[in-house]
Amino acid sequence: MSDSNMVASWSRLAPRLLSVLRIVGAFMFILAGTSKLFAFPAGIPPDGGTVELMSQIGLGAILELVGGGLLLLGLFTRPVAFILSGEMAVAYFQFHFPQSFWPSINGGAAAVLFCFVWLYISAAGAGPWSLDAVRRK
């Protein structure tokens, strides 16, 4: 198989890989929310507890759980991903950035990554394995 044929065959997987990126990212995002809200699968440091529900971090955890669930299903993907991208930008600049410029030092690498993955998905859409795709038919 020539290089151009391999690239062409790999490129055909792009829509499905977009769905995989959305699904895996959403699952990880849900886990971030459940850790904060229910201490599952583990609580938040330093004591392994949960956050105050009526706090800014509590609101973020609700967005992670509900928004992550919608993204997992691929439902209302573009607006939800855009909102969650903004949430992660706020989380980074408000909580991580003041500690250090570098995400690897300030603990904000996941927030930066989620911010840009959700921003991309808000532009690219949910992919073929989604309720949005079913609703379009």
Where are the regions a protein language model picked out?
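Alpha-helical transmembrane segments and their immediate interhelical/interface regions
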Residues: 37-45
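Extended, low-polarity transmembrane helix blocks
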Residues: 1-38, 54-62, 66, 73-137
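Perimembrane loop-to-helix junctions flanking transmembrane segments
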Residues: 44-58
